[in-house]
Regions:
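Small/aliphatic-rich secondary-structure junction motif
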Residues: 1-44, 142-200, 223, 281
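Gly/Ser-rich helix-loop-strand patches that form or flank binding pockets
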Residues: 87-137, 246-299
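Flexible internal linker/loop segments at domain or repeat junctions
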Residues: 186-214, 218, 226-227
């Protein structure tokens, strides 16, 4: 929780997630170190922040209704980079998921520096919450995957993306939108190069073959994930960096599930490249996963 934020969307979605998964929940509010001349008031300031947590928690629990998980609470001073403090805290305590309210971008898409730092370096599942206007039964959930993988880790990550997204959809509208982008990157080059004589028919056949291979791999991946329920597949032609943000806006997606890591073998999902470009255009909540075995550059103890 951010002491300077009045929003409770992250808290509401964290409580809802914990309830839906019968999980425990710990609330952590970080605040920056006070100036030297104000440090005498640190205890009083922490008491004030604790009161804010209790008030926000009560309001959200009442809004959710029914049985709600009773979380543990903690107020802690951040004496260094918030991304480092958060990551170390999660590593030391072994939490599976971090739910954080996305920093306010003033109505623009994308994520601010702290959230991007967590997307790059945080090792566990990360959920960046934004306001959701739909009622729970109408919440739109989408997942982005690339079935053409070059490693077992990348394949396993795709399976986890599908299964996690399906679980979220089951607790919302029941419908999961599965998005995958394909393209034939040499098409324009082959069409216009004077050095190769390729007929339009040959080129069209090559494009169809690429589409067919990609779609077959996508269908096989979805089958391997073993996800039941209503799954709507969107097999989009073009670059993921251009199409995913448009898809989210046009389809009014509330929650996007994606993979992000330095290198996984997942074409187009390289943080600092395609994935980062996609993140810059997202205006919805985001669940970001990394492959098993990913090691963060931030260590639990240093």
């Amino acid at each position: 929780m951010n002491p300077s934020s009045e929003g409770t969307d992250g808290l509401k979605q964290a409580l809802s997630t914990a309830r839906n998964n019968n999980a425990s929940l710990h609330l952590l509010m970080l605040y920056p170190a006070l100036p030297k001349e104000l440090q005498v008031h640190q205890k009083a300031f922490e008491a004030f922040l604790s009161e804010r947590i209790e008030a926000s928690l009560k309001n959200v629990q009442e809004a959710l209704g029914g049985e709600v998980v009773e979380p543990t609470r903690e107020v802690m001073m951040s004496d260094s980079s918030p991304a480092v403090v958060i990551t170390r805290y999660v590593l030391r305590h072994g939490y599976d998921l971090l739910v954080k309210e996305a920093e306010d971008t003033g109505g623009e898409g994308g994520f601010k520096a702290l959230d991007m730092s967590l997307l790059r370096k945080f090792p566990s599942a990360l959920y960046l919450a934004r306001p959701i206007s739909h009622s729970r039964e109408k919440i739109r959930v989408a997942v982005a995957v690339d079935p053409i993988t070059e490693s077992e880790d990348a394949y396993d990550l795709n399976i986890r993306l599908l299964q996690n997204a399906r679980s979220i959809a089951d607790s919302c509208s029941g419908v999961l939108d599965i998005v995958s982008c394909w393209e034939y990157p040499y098409e324009e080059y082959l069409r216009h190069t004077p050095w190769l004589k390729i007929s339009d028919e040959e080129l069209a056949d090559a494009v169809v073959n690429i589409w067919s291979e990609h779609r077959a791999a996508l269908d096989a991946l979805i089958a391997d994930a073993g996800i039941a329920g209503e799954n709507r597949v969107h097999h989009l032609r073009g670059e993921a960096r251009e199409l995913l943000g448009k898809f989210v806006r046009n389809e009014k997606v509330d929650i996007m599930v994606m993979g992000t890591v330095a290198r996984t073998g997942i074409t187009g999902f390289v943080i600092g490249n395609t994935a980062e470009n996609v993140f810059e255009k997202l205006d919805c909540s985001l669940l970001a996963l990394k492959p098993a075995g990913y090691v963060s550059p931030i260590k639990a103890y240093e």
